[in-house]
Amino acid sequence: MPRRQTTVDTHVHIWEMPPIAPIGPSAPNFTSKPKAHGNAELQLADMVANQVDKTVLVQTSFSTWDNEYVAASAIKYPDRFVSMGLVDPLDDKNAEQAVYWMDEREMQGFRFHPQYYSEVDILKRPENDAMFRQIEKRAGIVQIHNRPEHAHQLDYVAAKYPGITWLIDHMMYPEPNMAPDWDAYKPVLALAKHDNVLMKISDIHNRSESDEHPFSDMHDVIKMAMDAFGTNRVMWGTGYPGYHRVEHGWLSLADELKLVREGFGWLSSAEQDKYLGGNAMRIWNWNRE
């Protein structure tokens, strides 16, 4: 029997509730709060049920700047998880925080949200240079959550810090109304010129104007992104653990996998394997036991 390719979900938010872990905003005007936990064990059960081997855990925006629960979960289950945290881009001491989470709590990088800060280009902020230098020194990973109008910020830092691996979350949100020319999305595709920038092709159904699998109105832009970045620099990701997926408007994990395996018919078997896990196995350090 041929060996099954390792499947890696590169984007799942987990969280706990007080008193186990704090809940609260980590960005201006962010008021969302969960009603129940979405913990590591819920994600593990979902993975087992759907034959997903590994997951990149990402700190949520409603879990404060304290990354401890996410970091501890990855340390507890090193064969299953790695972790990505948050640090405050407006805190002038954030370099110290980045060093702590990477050196002491095994986090492999951080997520930033330029779209949450309308008054400042947070990635280009001079005060963040020390932080990015420390992340770069550790060959860290930074994932960027924003929209096409913020692509210029990633263009700047990807060139300035070539030792960081930069990830575009959720394709940077292309919308079907950008078709047929997709001019509004071209600044995102242009980021492929940086060899250290990769893209998570995820959250597809929430961008689609269709309610039906396989959300075909998104296929042209997915193909454009895969052509621009190449199948060695695209990765699969989802969103929330367990029942929280459907409850929060995401597809179930089974349907997320079905979308790729049945809906992305243009991918060869080898390309699908790279997208669903091979590339992620190369980007993160999974040898931590």
Regions found by a protein language model. Name each.
Residues D92-N94, A98-I144:
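Hydrophobic alpha-helical segments and helix pairs
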Residues A27-F62, R80-D88, Q108-Q115, V142:
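Divalent metal-dependent hydrolysis catalytic cores, especially in the metallo-beta-lactamase
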Residues D121-W236, H244, R282, R288:
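Catalytic pocket-lining loop regions of alpha/beta-barrel enzymes
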